[in-house]
Structure formats: C-alpha cells, structure tokens
C-alpha cells in the first residue's frame, strides 16, 4: 500500500507537470502569434489571394492543379504575393526576374522552416549550411564538379542507361503503354551509387542494396512530410509510424555511408591501393571529398563527409528522375521536336558505339529542348530563403531581415510578362540569340546566384547522355487515356506516373 504522503507527492507532481505543459504551450502560442504578426506586418504592402482562417493557402496549394492556380495569382498580383502555410508560416511568393535578382543575387540562407526537415537525414551539408562554413564547403566541393572530373562519367551514364533501355525493350514488346518513372528513378539512383561510391548494378552487395532502398524510402518519406502539416512538429512526427520508418531508413543510410568512409580511408593508407584508385577511369565523389583541402590544409570531418555524400545522393536522385521523365513526356507530346532531336544525335554519334564527352557540346537542338522542358516543368518548382538583411525591390517595396521568401520557379517560367505564349513548347527560346536578350534571372531551373546548384553541369551532362540514348532506341508517343497530372512536392512529379508508348527503332539506331 502506497503511503498517503507519497500519493500526495505524486498528485502534486502531476499537477506541476500539467501546469508546466500548459505554461509551455501558452508561451509557444504567444511566440507563434508574435511571429505571425511580424511576418504579416512585413508583407502588408503586398496584396494577395484570400486566406483560410486556419490553413492559410495550404489547402489550395495541395490540390491538383495548384501550380496553375499560383500562375493565375501571378497574373492577378504582379511581382509577388503573400503565401501562408497555415497561420504561422508566411512567405513572400515571388515570380518576377527583378524580384528574383534582388534576393538570389545575394546569398541569403535557406529557410529553416522548410529545410530543417532535411537535417535528420542529410545533416549540415551544402544545401542547408550558411555563412563561412557554407563558403568553405562550397570551395572544397567545387573541384569535384570540374569538367575534367565529369568527363569520365559519360561512360557511367551510358552503362546505367543501357541497362534501363534493355528493360524497356522487353516491356515495349507487349505493345502497351507503361510508366517509365520508376525505371528512370532506378537508373538515376544506380548512376549516383556508381559516381558516389564506385558501386553499381554489377557490384551491389547486401549492404549496398539496403542503402539503395533506404535512399528511395527517405526521399519519398520526406516528400510526404513536407505536405502533411500534422507531421511538421518533430515531437509528434517521431512518435508516428511514418516518423519511426524515417528514422530506421536514416540509420541504414548513415551506417552505410559511415562504413564506406571508414573503409575507403583505411584503404587509402595502403600506397598500392591509393595508386590503384588514382589510376581508375574516374574518381568517385567520395574519393574527391576525402582528398579535398582548403587553403589552410583543413579537410572535411567525418560528419561533414557524411553530410555532403548524403546531400549529393538526395539532390541528385529525384531531380534527375523528374527532369528526364518530363522531357520524354514533352518529346511524346511534340513529335516534331522528338524527330529533330533524334536526327541530331544520330548525326553526332555517326559510326561510334558510344557518346564521348566532346559530343555533348554538339547537341545544340537537344539542349534547347531540354531547357524548354525545364522551363515548362522545372524539376524543383519552388525554393525558399530567409533574408539575412533587408531588401528593397525594383518597385520600391521592401522586406525586413528575417522575412521568408518563396521563389516560385514554376510561376516564373510561365510568367507571360517574361515569356511570350508561355504555355507553348518553343525550343528556339533557348537559341543563343534569344537567350542573350533575356533577363539572367528569368530562367532558374538550377536556382541562381552564389547559392545556385553546384551539380548543374553533372545534371545537364547526365540529361544529355540519357535522353540522347533514349531517343536513339525508341520512338515515344502518348497514352491519351493516362496523361500525367502535375503534382508539386519537393520535386515536380506526376500524380499518376508517366505512361508512354515506346516503339523500338531498328538495328543501328542506337548502336
């Protein structure tokens, strides 16, 4: 039997705990209300669409067709308008080149309200770092994306793509349309495994396969968390099955990366192994990071190495998958452009069996079509920043430091004040002459300014090799009954996949 004084003590503790929770909850509410007041006051000069009393604009921007709704708002509210995710997170949503230049030519940090969700997986890598630490990492990583490093990757892109195309050859024999998205995703992730760790389909052990599945899982789970407001609170999220699944996948990914780093560092202590690695046809991303030193001869810590490897895997997987899938959809939708691209790459390939690095620079028309597909379907439709200092825009309106900015790339790319007939697929927009006349911040598929995508040359090189090989092997056409439905998440996906008809071309079309 529990003594009465202990019962009273437990009761008192319970009351104290309940009281403390109520006080903390009240203080949190006060903090949120003050933050809303600050954000709302900062944006009071910017009219915008009406908000829901509880959800702000969240319900509208999660609906099918929400991207085009934002485009319609852009017509109604030139330059920018407030965009509220619930009642406490408000961004100034911008979609005009001069407004974009005012913010993205600087180097303000990513908005923590969005990007802090990524920390559990990718840590503090280049995507979320700021200040001197970001600058140090940017300088250390830049040599890893130099042309001389990228050149040997053409063979890696070719190898992974050929595996995918052989699968498509079998599927195409059935004479029915099929969804290409998962196969493209598998190919893109397989390519990254080879370029990051020197692994691939020919050498995936159990540990590598588990990592491969974990990265796929983490990407999907992160997408789902971003659009599910009940998951935005960390404490609540980690208690849910969704959150626990995310943590398990994180552990698998981190264990794999840590072990590969340990093994590679140990191997590099052996001079023979080190020379063998240095003489390979290409250095993988991990080798480059391990050899990176700044001007003070300081190298990346193990935690930094893991963060940058995980960031590279995250940023380079879904974006590439999205870009390739939407491009092939555009080719199916516009067969005249598909035909012209195919003829160009056939002429470039000639009697060769494979594309060489120098061939990529000759793919003029294919590159213009890739860029036009990026304009209409940017792989990352929206990015976010937090102002580190005040900004004054071209029309005289301003925002204070601490304000949140949403750069709506999709709406920018369909802004009729910038792009005549924005819904029309016109590859000639990206001819040298036309591109030179355009505002430098009118086209931002890889963001812009000092914090632009460090891997854009890697991505464009992969896009060219993959799409050229696809067009040489198959003729793509639409399935009118299953057209893609745009679904904006962290990357631009299709709600129902990308169902295309593929017609194998004759021998010699793709070597």
From Swiss-Prot:
Induction: P450 can be induced to high levels in liver and other tissues by various foreign compounds, including drugs, pesticides, and carcinogens. GO terms for molecular function: heme binding; heterocyclic compound binding; iron ion binding; monooxygenase activity; oxidoreductase activity, acting on paired donors, with incorporation or reduction of molecular oxygen, reduced flavin or flavoprotein as one donor, and incorporation of one atom of oxygen; oxygen binding. Heme binds at residues 315, 453. Its main location: endoplasmic reticulum. PROSITE patterns: CYTOCHROME_P450. Its EC number is 1.14.14.1. One of its GO terms (cellular component) is endoplasmic reticulum membrane. The keyword Phosphoprotein applies. The modification Phosphoserine is found at residue 436. The keyword Heme applies. Detected in the liver and lung (at protein level). GO terms for biological process: biphenyl metabolic process; fatty acid metabolic process. Changing residue 375 to C: In allele CYP4B1*2. Changing residue 340 to C: In allele CYP4B1*2 and allele CYP4B1*7. Belongs to the cytochrome P450 family. Cytochromes P450 are a group of heme-thiolate monooxygenases. In liver microsomes, this enzyme is involved in an NADPH-dependent electron transport pathway. It oxidizes a variety of structurally unrelated compounds, including steroids, fatty acids, and xenobiotics. This is Cytochrome P450 4B1. It comes from Homo sapiens (Human).
């Amino acid at each position: 039997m529990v003594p009465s004084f202990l019962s009273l003590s437990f009761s008192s503790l319970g009351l104290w705990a309940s009281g403390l929770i109520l006080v903390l909850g009240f203080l949190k509410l006060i903090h949120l209300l003050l933050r809303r007041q600050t954000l709302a006051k900062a944006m009071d000069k910017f009219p915008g669409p009406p908000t829901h009393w509880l959800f702000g604009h969240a319900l509208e921007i999660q609906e099918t067709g929400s991207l085009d709704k934002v485009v319609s708002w852009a017509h109604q509210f030139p330059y920018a308008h407030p965009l509220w995710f619930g009642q406490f997170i408000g961004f100034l949503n911008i979609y005009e080149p001069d407004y974009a230049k005012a913010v993205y030519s600087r180097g303000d940090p990513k908005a923590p309200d969005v990007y802090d969700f990524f920390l559990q997986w990718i840590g503090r890598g280049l995507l979320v770092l700021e200040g001197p630490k970001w600058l140090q990492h940017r300088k250390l990583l830049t040599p890893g994306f130099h042309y001389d490093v990228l050149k040997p990757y053409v063979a890696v892109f070719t190898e992974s793509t050929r595996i995918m195309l052989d699968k498509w050859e079998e599927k195409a024999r059935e004479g029915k349309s099929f969804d290409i998205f998962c196969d493209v995703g598998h190919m893109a992730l397989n390519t990254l495994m080879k370029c990051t760790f020197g692994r691939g389909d020919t050498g995936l052990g159990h540990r590598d396969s588990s990592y491969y599945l974990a990265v796929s899982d983490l990407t999907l789970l992160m997408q789902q968390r971003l659009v599910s407001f009940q998951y935005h609170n960390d404490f609540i999220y980690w208690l849910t099955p969704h959150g626990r699944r995310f943590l398990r996948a994180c552990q698998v990914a981190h264990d794999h990366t840590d072990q590969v780093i340990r093994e590679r560092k140990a191997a590099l202590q052996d001079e023979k192994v080190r020379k063998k690695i240095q003489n390979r046809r290409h250095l993988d991303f991990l080798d480059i990071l391990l050899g990176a030193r700044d001007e003070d001869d300081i190298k990346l810590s193990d935690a930094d190495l893991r963060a940058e490897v995980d960031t590279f895997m995250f940023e380079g997987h879904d974006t590439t998958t999205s870009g390739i899938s939407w491009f092939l959809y555009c080719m199916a939708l516009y067969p005249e452009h598909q035909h012209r691209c195919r003829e160009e790459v056939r002429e470039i390939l000639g009697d060769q069996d494979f594309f060489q690095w120098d061939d990529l620079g000759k793919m003029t028309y294919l590159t213009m079509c890739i860029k036009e597909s990026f304009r209409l379907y940017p792989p990352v439709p929206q990015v976010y920043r937090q102002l580190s200092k005040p900004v004054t825009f071209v029309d005289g309106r301003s925002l204070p430091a601490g304000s949140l900015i949403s750069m709506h790339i999709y709406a920018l790319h369909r802004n009729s004040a910038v792009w005549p007939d924005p819904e029309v697929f016109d590859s000639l927009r990206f001819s040298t002459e036309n591109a030179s006349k355009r505002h430098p911040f009118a086209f931002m598929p890889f963001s812009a300014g000092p914090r632009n995508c460090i891997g854009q040359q890697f991505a464009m090189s992969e896009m060219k090799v993959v799409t050229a090989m696809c067009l040489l092997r198959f003729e793509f056409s639409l399935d009118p009954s299953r057209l893609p439905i745009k679904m904006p998440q962290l990357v631009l996906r299709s709600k129902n996949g990308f169902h295309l008809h593929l017609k194998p071309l004759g021998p010699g079309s793709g070597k």
